[in-house]
From Swiss-Prot:
It is found in: Nucleus; Cytoplasm, Perinuclear region. Phosphorylated with a circadian rhythmicity, probably by the double-time protein (dbt). Phosphorylation could be implicated in the stability of per monomer and in the formation of heterodimer per-tim. It comes from Drosophila saltans (Fruit fly). Residues 9-31 have a biased composition (Low complexity). Keywords: Biological rhythms, Cytoplasm, Nucleus, Phosphoprotein, Repeat. Essential for biological clock functions. Determines the period length of circadian and ultradian rhythms; an increase in PER dosage leads to shortened circadian rhythms and a decrease leads to lengthened circadian rhythms. Essential for the circadian rhythmicity of locomotor activity, eclosion behavior, and for the rhythmic component of the male courtship song that originates in the thoracic nervous system. The biological cycle depends on the rhythmic formation and nuclear localization of the TIM-PER complex. Light induces the degradation of TIM, which promotes elimination of PER. This is Period circadian protein.
Length: 66
């Protein structure tokens, strides 16, 4: 489960190396909890990665501007 999550998040890692750890953590939490059968944790974690995948791009742009 963890390795699968990191693999999918690998696509986002190319966008920003710093946010890689944060994205992988959220994705692992989502897949891990869902795999465990915790629908409550799965739904919560799942929402994080999806919405979180977009903000990193804006954050990277701000860093580039600096």
């Amino acid at each position: 489960e963890g390795s699968g999550g990191s693999g999918s998040s690998g696509n986002f890692t190319t966008g920003s190396n710093i946010h890689m750890s944060s994205v992988t953590n959220t994705s692992n939490a989502g897949t891990g909890t869902s795999g465990t059968g915790n629908s409550g944790g799965g739904s919560g974690g799942g929402t994080g990665p999806g919405s979180g995948a977009i903000p990193p791009v804006t954050l990277t742009e701000s860093l580039l501007n600096k």
